[in-house]
Curated annotation (Swiss-Prot):
Function recorded in the entry: Catalyzes the attachment of alanine to tRNA(Ala) in a two-step reaction: alanine is first activated by ATP to form Ala-AMP and then transferred to the acceptor end of tRNA(Ala). Also edits incorrectly charged Ser-tRNA(Ala) and Gly-tRNA(Ala) via its editing domain.
InterPro entries named among the record's database cross-references: aa-tRNA-synth_II/BPL/LPL, Ala-tRNA-lgiase_IIc, Ala-tRNA-ligase_IIc_anticod-bd, Ala-tRNA-synth_IIc_core, Ala-tRNA-synth_IIc_N, Ala-tRNA_ligase, Ala_tRNA_ligase_euk/bac, DHHA1_dom
Name the UniProt record assigns to this protein: Alanine--tRNA ligase
Entry keywords, A to Z: Aminoacyl-tRNA synthetase, ATP-binding, Cytoplasm, Ligase, Metal-binding, Nucleotide-binding, Protein biosynthesis, RNA-binding, tRNA-binding, Zinc
Reactions the enzyme catalyzes: tRNA(Ala) + L-alanine + ATP = L-alanyl-tRNA(Ala) + AMP + diphosphate
Length: 879
């Protein structure tokens, strides 16, 4: 066979179809664009849906690709079997209203038997039951053995994957056995036994399915083929599974080296090796496409894969973070086809390292708690872990539900998934209730949402801050009204307005509304569900009626400040991408008159030097006095021009593009200044994390930034005065004082420990016998956790057959420590169980091993009650 290596097979396929006048396209991102039906790209044709359905014009009627894909539907089987994987590459050639069955069938045969030189006697073909046309072309345009062609039903030879283009198909299979099927039943049996494996699927796309069994004919017939690169490599390299082909074997061997194990010697070890090998491929490619670990959507898929792989690394005995280095093998073997991997190598490694470290910090604690829960289940002869316990592991220790399930299944146990989801639902309801509002400024929200669809409201405020308009609707409280008078708080809807309604993170305009008979304040401007611009008005004097003509006047000074802040967010977005990398994407914003807030994707806290650089770049753009131009253009034209936008959102065909020279170009419907110089000054107030993988920057501009600088200067002046030093000497003076304080704190700690040690005899002498075990339960004051552990050790070492539980009240909180020697444990003493109940009495929580446990509490006033309970708890434990 001419080609065997995976990378060579990819090139051979793409080159073959280029020779057939196909346009070779790079793989699309794993993140679907403008397709809400998919979480991740899971098929070669998925990114090409708009071409198949006619929504977009393809760059050429013939296209070929090798598309990276991720499927997680079978994730629970990945590793358990050697067949399943989450990441794969799909070779494909596509025709959009050009060639059809007559061309693709002989081409497919030519590639497999001519280019790849596969033996014809090993190839089998299946076609859809009544597809006589396909049968004719196979028998007249190729030299396939007719006895190797089988007709199968819809389940096997009608391709559809959710909603979208679909149709009958023909599949080409490779036989790995000497057995020869005589009919379709025997063929299916051999196929189910993996003795004959599918290599290539040629889909004759004729329909657009809605995923519910309904089909419409497409405007023109299309071709969509898919051949899994890894599966093809299995055939060409004569391997038994995808984990043995060159690219995956390289990863698997590296994991084996790290864990000092070999593949094929132990089934349990093999499962872990396969899981890590597969998952690191998905992880690497997902991060390269700017997917960040999070608790929802595709970010959750990434987090689940990463944490599952990390857990199996620990199972194999790998102690340190390793996935961040294992991705080097993926990048090395795949970067020739996907150069972005090499470009983003350090970024990929960093994201993995941070997430891996974060999980490893909680993995041990979480596993300890889960192991205790498993022990309790087995002791009580129970098989199902409560949903509330599973949810706590997820909420506190970051254990995805699926990971908890997997660990439980290894022990022959299961999770109450319904209970888990109920806990999740309750948490979301609590969050939703905290946000929910039933009215706005005294006006019923439901009433606002049923304003007549016949009323048209037009925004004409980009160039105007004052307009004459006609009042179309009034809403006063819960009801529509014909008029409003002095003292009313109402909603006014007009036919036209210069007031910008809150949208895209920018707050609504305020100002005045008046005519000869009425004067009112516009306190806010929003849009209702129907898209009507609604003004929230406080009636100051006179009467306003439906049909009246009024003057609407925006508070221009306030709007100017909003415009400064909005343009500044664009400059900030651009600066963040330049400093932190192309993975940065807007995740939200808030633009008001006095400040701005910008949320963005990033995997760690922004370093101080990075923040300074970002701030510098924004101020450089401001000081460049660059004109800010706004242009209306087609959406596709805007994309092609390099304009930044959240393209998962829905845009109209015509969009506004706001451009600040070389500094920024974004799709935006908000209001902006006409020159960057008008911003004046930009200062960052804070940077912090608001969710996993999401950071937030708050900043001020113009006079607010000037005030901030002055306030900081005044603060420095006051601090230097208090410290009796110059402003330049403040840090050194504080360092000196901090050092002196630490020395004094150390002296105090030593003294406290000495005082506590003086009580050691009293503590030992307090021991009481409970069922043959010496129980010490004693309360101390102002002893920290470390000193308390030391005292516990002393008591344990001096009192045989003992369980010791000590408490200490420190700054209104309680520290608890318990230790038991081997003899006490052998009799049934269990520090973890004792301390768990004691901590509950003290308003806290904790746990641990039979011989040692720690906890904390918030109710020092209940220490006496808690200590009294120790004897009773031990009495129930000791048989």
């Amino acid at each position: 066979m001419k080609f065997t290596k995976t990378n060579d097979l990819r090139d051979a396929y793409l080159n073959f179809f280029e020779s057939k006048d196909h346009l070779k396209l790079e793989s699309f991102s794993l993140v679907p664009q403008n397709d809400k039906s998919l979480l991740l790209i899971n098929a070669g044709m998925a990114p090409l849906k708009p071409y198949f359905t006619g929504l977009q014009e393809p760059p050429k009627k013939r296209i070929t690709t090798c598309q990276k894909c991720v499927r997680t539907g079978d994730i629970d089987n990945v590793g358990i079997t050697s067949r399943h994987g989450t990441f794969f590459e799909m070779l494909g050639n596509f025709s959009f209203g050009d060639y059809f069955k007559k061309e693709i069938i002989p081409w497919a045969w030519e590639f497999l038997t001519g280019v790849l030189e596969l033996p014809k006697e090993k190839l089998y073909v299946t076609i859809y039951l009544d597809d006589d046309e396909a049968y004719e072309y196979w028998t007249t345009l190729t030299d396939v053995d007719k006895s190797h062609i089988f007709r199968l039903g819809k389940e096997d030879n009608f391709w559809e994957h959710g909603a979208g283009p679909c149709g009958p198909c023909t599949e080409i299979h490779f036989s790995r056995t000497d057995e020869v099927p005589k009919n379709s039943e025997e063929f299916v049996e051999l196929s189910d036994a993996d003795k004959i494996i599918e290599v290539w699927n040629l889909v004759f796309t004729q329909f657009d399915g809605d995923g519910k069994g309904n089909y419409e004919k497409l405007a023109s017939t299309n071709i969509d083929t898919g051949m899994g690169l890894e599966r093809l490599a299995v055939v060409m390299q004569n391997k038994n599974s995808i984990f043995e082909i060159d690219t995956l074997e390289n990863i698997l061997k590296e994991v084996g080296n790290l864990a000092s194990v070999k593949y094929g010697e132990d089934n349990k070890i093999d499962v872990s090796l396969r899981i890590i090998t597969d998952h690191i491929r998905s992880i690497t490619f997902m991060i390269s496409d700017d997917i960040m670990p999070s608790n929802e959507g595709r970010g959750y898929v990434l987090r689940r894969l990463l944490r599952r792989a990390a857990r199996h690394g620990k199972t194999l005995g790998i102690k340190d973070a390793f996935l961040c280095n294992l991705c080097d093998v993926v990048i090395r073997d795949c970067s020739s086809a996907y150069p972005d991997l090499e470009v983003k190598k350090e970024y990929i490694k960093k994201v993995i390292k941070i997430e891996e470290d974060k999980f490893r910090e909680t993995l041990d604690s979480g596993m300890e708690i889960l192991n205790n829960l498993i022990s309790e289940l087995k002791e009580n002869n129970e098989k199902v872990l409560k949903g509330a316990d599973g949810f706590k592991l997820y909420d506190t220790f970051g254990f995805p539900m699926e990971l908890t399930k997997e660990i439980l299944e290894d022990e022959g146990l299961s999770l109450d998934e319904d209970g888990f989801h109920e806990e999740m639902k309750e948490q979301r309801e609590r969050a939703r209730s905290a946000r929910k509002t039933s009215n706005y400024m005294g006006t019923d929200v439901k009433t606002l949402d049923i304003i007549s669809s016949e009323i048209e409201t037009t925004f004409d405020g980009y160039e105007n801050d004052s307009l004459i308009a006609e009042v179309k609707t009034l809403v006063n409280g819960e009801d529509f009204a014909d008029s409003i008078t002095e003292g009313d708080n109402a909603v006014v809807v007009t036919d036209v307005t210069p007031f910008y309604a809150e949208m895209g993170g920018q707050i609504g305009d305020t100002g005045t509304i008046y005519n000869d008979n009425f004067k009112g304040k516009i306190l806010d401007t929003k849009k209702n569900i129907g898209g009507k611009i609604i003004h929230f008005v406080e009636a100051i004097s006179g009467e306003l009626k439906v049909g009246d003509k009024v003057t609407l006047e925006v508070d221009n000074a306030r709007r100017e400040n909003i415009k400064k802040n909005h343009t500044a967010t664009h400059l900030l977005d651009s600066a963040l991408v330049k400093v932190l990398g192309s993975h940065v994407h807007q995740a939200g914003s808030y633009v008001s008159a006095d400040r701005l807030r910008f949320d963005f994707s990033h995997f760690e806290g922004v370093k101080e030097e990075e923040l300074l650089k970002v701030e510098q770049l924004v101020n450089e753009a401001i000081m460049s006095v660059t004109p800010v131009n706004t242009t209306e253009m087609d959406l596709q034209e805007a994309k092609n021009s390099g304009a930044v936008g959240i393209f998962d959102d829905k845009y109209a065909e015509k969009v506004r593009v706001v451009c600040a020279g070389e500094y920024s170009k974004e799709l935006c419907g908000g209001t902006h200044i006409d020159n960057t110089g008008k911003i004046g000054l930009f200062k960052i107030i804070s940077e912090n994390g608001i969710a996993a993988g999401t950071r937030r920057i708050e900043a001020v501009t113009g006079m607010e930034a000037y005030k901030l600088v002055n306030e900081k200067a005044e603060l420095l002046k006051q601090i230097s005065g208090k410290l009796k030093c110059s402003e330049k000497e403040i840090t050194s003076k504080l360092d000196q004082q901090s050092k002196e304080m630490k020395e004094k704190e150390k002296e105090i700690t030593i003294l406290k420990s000495k005082f506590a040690s003086m009580e050691i005899n009293d503590i030992i002498n307090s021991a009481k016998d409970v069922k043959g075990i010496n129980i010490v339960a004693y309360a101390l004051k102002d002893v920290d956790g470390e000193a308390l552990r030391g005292l516990c050790e002393k008591v344990r070492d001096n009192v045989n057959n003992s369980l010791t539980l000590l408490t200490s009240s420190v700054d209104g909180k309680v520290v608890i420590c318990a230790m038991a020697d081997k003899e006490a444990v052998s009799k049934g003493a269990h520090c973890g169980k004792v301390i768990k109940e004691v901590a509950t009495i003290l308003g806290g929580g904790g746990g641990g091993r039979p011989d040692m446990a720690q906890a904390g509490g918030k109710l020092p006033e209940k220490i006496s009650e808690a200590l009294d309970s120790v004897y009773k708890i031990v009495e129930t434990l000791v048989k």
